[in-house]
Amino acid sequence: LKENPNMCAYKAPSLDAREDMMIREVPRVGKEAATKAIKEWGQPMSKITHLIFCTTSGVALPGVDYELIVLLGLDPSVKRYMMYHQGCFAGGTVLRLAKDLAENNKDARVLIVCSENTAVTFRGPSETDMDSLVGQALFADGAAAIIIGSDPVPEVENPLFEIVSTDQKLVPNSHGAIGGLLREVGLTFYLNKSVPDIISQNINDALSKAFDPLGISDYNSIFWIAHPGGPAILDQVEQKVNLKPEKMNATRDVLSNYGNMSSACVFFIMDLMRKKSLEEGLKTTGEGLDWGVLFGFGPGLTIETVVLRSVAI
């Protein structure tokens, strides 16, 4: 920041400096997350067939996905999918895409990497732009990686969760609720104060569509991995669905300790949940429960819904 004082000003031209940072740092931190995931997976990198890379931070050609392949030393025949500027719902999007790839390509192993860095949005405050100030308080840096596949090899691959179904919905009459624009000053964004209301008013429809086919209507009987857009969103969702406060413990812990890391958040929550479930001697990775939901909320306004099934510990 000392070398780039325009980034500390309010809306001073600074895109070149921001992009130079992002193009370098996003794949570097993504590599750290991917290396951890691959080590826990325990299989050779040569078995990775697809890469999905997601970021709202920095745009380049041939892309930060390409840079990650070089950094990791992945096979050049790995099929890559780059997702730029999707925002906070994209943790659900990458799972939806990975599920389709894994189920429709024999022996596929899909490496997902979400790497987010707030240098693209960081700027000084202004009394005339509370959206920016709220964002500076909520958003944070983070990277996460996970490997998705069908038909795990017995006694070799140890699944953590199963993706059962996925869905995406553009909420009617919500245009302009959340959005962003890449400008000379970096990525600017806007957050309508009605966002918590919009999400809470549509959460029951998303839950019904996902769980009615399974005969589940008690949403306290499932585990929750909800993107922590902010405390107000979590509060209103809890109230609307009559959730017990502890259902959002993992989500609130991640928001409190790490902040809103956009697409990477849900994977931090998933990781925390499965580790605490093991530490507490519960019977499954999902707080001892069988079924769960993963929600992504973001620009559009878009809701991603993923039905998960836990794995016995």
From Swiss-Prot:
EC number: 2.3.1.95
The keyword Endoplasmic reticulum is annotated on this UniProt entry: no
Active site: 88
Localisation: Cytoplasm
Name used for this protein in its record: Putative stilbene synthase 2
Residues noted as binding substrate in the record, renumbered to the chain: 191, 229-231
GO molecular function, one term: trihydroxystilbene synthase activity
Keywords annotated in UniProt: Acyltransferase, Cytoplasm, Transferase
Gene Ontology CC entries for this record: cytoplasm
InterPro entries in the cross-refs: Chalcone/stilbene_synt_C, Chalcone/stilbene_synt_N, Chalcone/stilbene_synthase_AS, Polyketide_synthase_type-III, Thiolase-like
Organism superkingdom: Eukaryota
One GO term (biological process): polyketide biosynthetic process
UniProt keyword Transmembrane helix present: no
Catalytic activity: 4-coumaroyl-CoA + 3 malonyl-CoA + 3 H(+) = trans-resveratrol + 4 CO2 + 4 CoA
Pathway: Phytoalexin biosynthesis; 3,4',5-trihydroxystilbene biosynthesis; 3,4',5-trihydroxystilbene from trans-4-coumarate: step 2/2
Family statement drawn from the similarity comment of this UniProt entry: Belongs to the thiolase-like superfamily. Chalcone/stilbene synthases family.
Organism, scientific name: Arachis hypogaea (Peanut)
Subunit structure: Homodimer.
